[in-house]
Amino acid sequence: MNQLTGQLVQYGRHRQRRSYARISEVLELPNLIEIQTSSYQWFLDEGLREMFQDISPIEDFTGNLSLEFIDYSLGDPKYPVEESKERDVTYSAPLRVKVRLINKETGEVKDQDVFMGDFPIMTDTGTFIINGAERVIVSQLVRSPSVYFSGKVDKNGKKGFTATVIPNRGAWLEYETDAKDVVYVRIDRTRKLPVTVLLRALGFGSDQEILDLIGENEYLRNTLDKDNTENSDKALLEIYERLRPGEPPTVENAKSLLDSRFFDPKRYDLANVGRYKINKKLHIKNRLFNQRLAETLVDPETGEILAEKGQILDRRTLDKVLPYLENGIGFRKLYPNGGVVEDEVMLQSIKIYAPTDAEGEQTINVIGNAYIEEAIKNITPADIISSISYFFNLLHGVGDTDDIDHLGNRRLRSVGELLQNQFRIGLSRMERVVRERMSIQDTNTITPQQLINIRPVIASIKEFFGSSQLSQFMDQTNPLAELTHKRRLSALGPGGLTRERAGMEVRDVHYSHYGRMCPIETPEGPNIGLINSLSSFAKVNRFGFIETPYRRVDPETGKVTPRIDYLTADEEDNYVVAQANAKLSDDGSFLDDSIVARFRGENTVVARNRVDYMDVSPKQVVSAATACIPFLENDDSNRALMGANMQRQAVPLMQPEAPIVGTGMEYVSGKDSGAAVICKHPGIVERVEAKNVWVRRYEEIDGQKVKGNLDKYSLLKFVRSNQGTCYNQRPIVSVGDEVVKGEILADGPSMELGELALGRNVMVGFMTWDGYNYEDAIIMSERLVKDDVYTSIHIEEYESEARDTKLGPEEITRDIPNVGEDALRNLDDRGIIRIGAEVNDGDLLVGKVTPKGVTELTAEERLLHAIFGEKAREVRDTSLRVPHGGGGIIHDVKVFNREDGDELPPGVNQLVRVYIVQKRKISEGDKMAGRHGNKGVISKILPEEDMPYLPDGTPIDIMLNPLGVPSRMNIGQVLELHMGMAARYLGIHIASPVFDGAREEDVWETLEEAGMSRDAKTVLYDGRTGEPFDNRVSVGIMYMIKLAHMVDDKLHARSTGPYSLVTQQPLGGKAQFGGQRFGEMEVWALEAYGAAYTLQEILTVKSDDVVGRVKTYEAIVKGDNVPEPGVPESFKVLIKELQSLGMDVKILSGDEEEIEMRDLEDEEDAKQADGLALSGDEAPEETASPDVERDAVTKE
């Protein structure tokens, strides 16, 4: 054994685990939700300021008035977080901006503080509360603005290239070659033009100027031959015709159009990242590397020769020349005339021999953009010329094409930037309004407040939080789901990809994902590979690129230093990186001579002196959820993906239990998820209650501990999460404990002693039992039901609102028509259910009546009206009732009244919210899973006495099918099973970190230590007969979780219910209380059996024969024979469809008589005409009125 394995490691205050790690951790895991919090913090500190600087000053059309934004401040939130949730409001703070209005004529300056709306504030846990619902803004992966070159092969097999200049916002520039070796340019996706047209338009009018600039070559000659414009003016007109077809072109218009398209910073923005990427790509050194010079390089200051003509620039020479390159070698000033560009253009150009030329005589120009400052955010003529030069260089074999799936070319837009973009849209709309108002209103009396209209700003922010694809309702099933959701990276969304267009390449795992994006955790289904998760150690840099930490190797000594560098994907491409498991001596030098390392996605073996960096940790590859799977290295990746995804669906149990076999990641995940209560300052616990913990702060003054303030931490008690699971916190510290900053004071849901605890440790045997675990089904002992091992608490929220209707206000009352006293027994005098009452399906929760329409009065009613003066108030019962499957215990009732000053939506006078809590024991049909993607449905719950038992008489808890293991190749579950059994006997907990956990030998040694046999199998006895089974069976402790797919939520039955308006067929789905569709294939089955009457009944009275279904219902109620079915409504719809196409459709009987179609009303009229009027209690059934889908039988 390695000296590290078998050490006890402390996780938090309460838990020790025996760790099987061989590699010591050199870097603490970062705060896992930092990606959210730091991005939002940047937005508040810098992002907003940038926006206000970009937009100010706003000047009117004459340039007389100017409005500047000077400073801004955020006030305090109106309500605290919990109260915002309760009141259904947004957790936000008022944004006030200091604005200055300057009148240049009079020199008058007015300063004013302007309120710019309430701005949503991020909570400490990285979420937003919007209208009372907790939401998360997911980070978006997009292509970075830059210039991209890529190869293409046309249909004749000829190789060519395409290039694209992609800005953050603005017009795209695309270059491409065709079959005849002509180079074309497209401006903003219009038709293509020869690239020389663009050069002429910039101000290089003659052929000779262009040849001098780019360098003589055959591709340029072909392009010039194709180009039929001779000078700048014609080129400008040509471009104008392409961009604005149909408008009369003039040279001046064309100049201003091109100028505004590309060189106006307001219209064209590369952002910081775009300028950085373009400077990097167009830097001349990348194209000079390993090329043969066609001119001598001389230091312009001293005249010293740096490199001879004909010399090859290898890495050494290039490193020597580099400082001089940036200092002015090859710099050229160009003076374009007659085109868009008025000023001189600075370029850097060096001649080299073309590597593709056989004789080696052809020279080509390599042009760089001469290091433009980062402050210039728009594209410059130098950028355009050097990108064209790069394109011609590529045709001669100089330069590299780009891989757009490389993470060096994809960046993250996190919360801050997404908000900033949205805010920019609002501000630019506001700017337009300000300009208009400046020109309309009187300049002397005007104030900043009158100019500024904050509506567009508020609207754009509201729209973003409310309806953007990236603003998502937080997945709050358990703390891990919360954590993962905040670390999610999506390639979808505005400005991103769409599911349909995304091909295989985008979705695939790329070598640059290493340590940045998890290769395992991604959804199954249409979004696979488009939604990813951030790796555990990854950070995001200021440009939005994902960085991962590496340990620096000192190039002089070859030792691994304690210094840690964060590298982006394209920086990493320049280095050789060793794996985290490379063997090191105590002083940090490599023990082996040859070392397995990575270089640009290739795994190679290199000499130890060639290593530049070393991985920080084996788990830096995977995400937080994947790092919670022990023995991950023994699982197939497809199953690991399911394991990582299913942990997020674990339902918090009543008595959670941390895994006996963990990975050591449980503590960090639990702490950072935001579900636990974290101590903010060091101190001593003074008082602990179920709902609150009080901590007395300690201040260090001159080395003495001095008592400070008393902090009160409130705990959540039985709160409904977004997904209807129960969020409940319990204190785990006791009075007198000294606590430090960052310590866990109270466990959240699915946590035990500060560790994530999604399920329970149960005794599992791999064996079949009378075929009940066919197809991954699970057989379970009744003990798990009886002892509430897998019992979870679910809270559902129901609301009823009393509105103003056209006929009068609705009223919440106990006085409901046609409801007996028995049904009202649990309602209080207001008509609202009492807390603690037990309710079943269909019980009243809130009594509510709605005024009915005024109907024509009968003679009797008119008489009563004449005598008593008041018509008996006509009301309908619209009470809130418990839906199917929603019964439980009333946990809480909240009442909001407009009179009491509560903010309610317009038209609502009173709102009642009722929370029903259910205790759900595990039952047949529930879905369960392990952590290795081994999922199944419970098929049978056996009495404890029938379960197989161990030699000491202990019955096992769960039986799994052994056939579920070999084909799925998730062997990790078997190792977990054995390790768990050994740990149970030894009374310890175990940490087996991913990719660095217990090996087979460790498992066997631990088994022997626990006194078990090496194969960990045992004799089992049949609980029914007491006979031993023929073979020994693998039995052990496995961590099993109960998933959110519970049979109680899926069970559904209907006899009558709502029908669709057009076809009159029952609706579908449990949510609509729909029926089971009897489709085309099912009809074939009945036809095959010749079950004619069953089939007729299904297609008519049980579906859309409107008349027939009412009559059938009546007949069943009265006990009569069921009448003949009529014509299905969908047949009538078909006839109408044909009639709408202009066909005259008649239905004829067998003897050519026309059959008349009759509606329900016609039937009733006919009956009444025949003197068969219905008695009062069987009034004619109303068909569904066009505005409401209703139950045709119970009329609800």
UniProtKB/Swiss-Prot annotation:
This is DNA-directed RNA polymerase subunit beta. It catalyses: RNA(n) + a ribonucleoside 5'-triphosphate = RNA(n+1) + diphosphate. Belongs to the RNA polymerase beta chain family. DNA-dependent RNA polymerase catalyzes the transcription of DNA into RNA using the four ribonucleoside triphosphates as substrates. Signal peptide: none annotated. The gene is rpoB. It comes from Bacillus velezensis (strain DSM 23117 / BGSC 10A6 / LMG 26770 / FZB42). GO terms for cellular component: DNA-directed RNA polymerase complex. Residues 1152-1196 are annotated as: Disordered. Keywords: DNA-directed RNA polymerase, Nucleotidyltransferase, Transcription, Transferase. GO terms for biological process: DNA-templated transcription. InterPro entries: DNA-dir_RNA_pol_bsu_ext_1_sf, DNA-dir_RNA_pol_bsu_external_1, DNA-dir_RNA_pol_su2, DNA-dir_RNAP_su2_dom, DNA-dir_RNAP_su2_hyb_sf, RNA_pol_bsu_bac, RNA_pol_bsu_CS, RNA_pol_bsu_protrusion.
